[in-house]
From Swiss-Prot:
Keywords: Membrane, Transmembrane, Transmembrane helix. PANTHER family: TRANSMEMBRANE PROTEIN 88-RELATED (PTHR28628), TRANSMEMBRANE PROTEIN 88B (PTHR28628:SF2). Belongs to the TMEM88 family. One of its GO terms (biological process) is negative regulation of canonical Wnt signaling pathway. It is found in: Membrane. The chain crosses the membrane at residues 39-59, 65-85, 111-131. It is a multi-pass membrane protein. This is Transmembrane protein 278. Residues 1-28 are annotated as: Disordered. One of its GO terms (cellular component) is plasma membrane.
Length: 166
């Protein structure tokens, strides 16, 4: 820009920044290499570590929730199926039961199947609890114990303190 053009611009109230390039200039090579310095790598590693830690915590939470649900569902499914079959074939639930139900079960038979299904629930609950405890013991590294447990606690001086619930 010549001196005369600058004077004209200043007279018109133009700012020299109006003629500045809109895009930033390319970084020199030594500044571009700063982006790949060990500081950036450690920052990226810390960020990745934080994401992995939160992902691991989420996986443990899902395992805590889904493991008992899956075990109890699988173990209690036969009892639920028997109860459903009993209700499906009973004439008071369905006024006109299917011919296959009539051939297999009368109303008394359907009631007996319903009672059998409900009576099989407690032993199956015990079996499901035992299976869940065994799986939790095997997966102990993935399922750490809870941080708080009720019962007597040791004080720092070795005395026992009993927590009473009111």
């Amino acid at each position: 820009m010549s001196d005369q053009e600058r004077e004209t611009e200043e007279d018109e109230g133009g700012d020299p920044s109006d003629t500045a390039p809109m895009l930033p200039q390319r970084l020199p090579d030594h500044q571009a290499s700063d982006l790949m310095s060990p500081g950036w790598a450690s920052l990226a590693a810390r960020g990745l570590g934080t994401l992995l830690f939160q992902g691991w915590a989420l996986a443990r939470l899902l395992l805590h929730l889904l493991l008992p649900a899956a075990v109890f569902l699988l173990v209690l499914l036969p009892a639920a199926a028997v109860v459903y079959l009993g209700f499906l074939c009973h004439s008071r639930v369905h006024p006109a039961p299917r011919p296959a139900c009539r051939a297999l079960l009368s109303d008394r038979g359907s009631a007996a199947v319903i009672v059998l299904g409900f009576l099989s629930l407690p032993p199956l609950l015990v079996l499901a609890s035992a299976a869940r405890a065994r799986l939790a013991r095997r997966l102990h590294s993935l399922l750490p114990p809870p941080t708080w447990s009720p019962g007597p606690h040791r004080q720092s001086d070795g005395e026992k303190q009993l927590c009473a619930w009111v």
